[in-house]
Amino acid sequence: MSLEDRAKATGKNIEGKAQEALGNVTGDPEDKAEGKAKQAESEVRHGVEDVKDNVKKKID
């Protein structure tokens, strides 16, 4: 996985955690939901890149 892709996914996770926390503090369910969605997107991105890494290792 490229370092850039991993950094983007990690950034998205941090952004999601911050947004979810803001939603918890303000009581805004939309912020909470969007924050959780960003975290889920980050997990999917990491998973896809991990699969790419594993395939590349097997090919090499």
Swiss-Prot record:
InterPro entries: CsbD, YjbJ_sf. Residues 1-60 are annotated as: Disordered. Residues 1-18, 29-60 have a biased composition (Basic and acidic residues). It comes from the Bacteria. Pfam families: CsbD. Belongs to the UPF0337 (CsbD) family. This is UPF0337 protein asr1134. It comes from Nostoc sp. (strain PCC 7120 / SAG 25.82 / UTEX 2576).
